[in-house]
Amino acid sequence: QDCSQSELVLDLLEQFLEAGFSKETAIRMINSSLVLQPDARIFSTMDLAAIDLYTGVCEFLKIGSSASFLKKEHGVECIHGYSLPAGVSGQLSLDPFRIRMYDGNLLFMVTDGVLGALPVGEEEQILKDLIGNLPAGTPAEMAERLLEQVEAYGGGTDDMTVLVVGIWKR
């Protein structure tokens, strides 16, 4: 059921954005539809990153989602959101966070299952270390390697997804 709810939220988000709604308006409309469900309370995390390819500015809207990680030339930065999941309350707090990405930066977005597979209290630091020590490769290769390393901890009971996006100058 969680999978079908996630697919519904993703489909709605895509449709609203394709129809020309702003990211914020689309998320607020989805939140309202989840809050007003008559049969059951449905909650959904949303993790949205929009990168302006001309300026390199990445805007994050993190709605109850896990931390993301930005791998730079000299380290890994953790990006948090502090809002509750969509569907919890009619008043959704949207606090966009912007960060400039530069040539060679890599953005790692992970589901809560990835962090949940790591030792409690150390999740983010372990993931930062794993990302920082990943050998160079394509984003797909790096995502696969990271997932394999996290799975080696053996604590995963939830689904795990890793998405890696890179920025390079032409």
Predicted regions and their residues:
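Active-site-proximal, acidic helix/loop segment immediately C-terminal to a metal-coordinating Asp/Glu
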Residues: Q1-A19, H80-S83, M101, N105-T157
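Catalytic core of PPM/PP2C metal-dependent serine/threonine phosphatase domains
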Residues: D2-H74, H80, L94, E148-M160, ...
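Short, structured beta-strand/loop micro-motifs enriched in basic residues and often containing a Trp
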Residues: A86-Q91
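Intrinsically disordered or compositionally simple regulatory linkers and C-terminal tails
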Residues: W168-R170
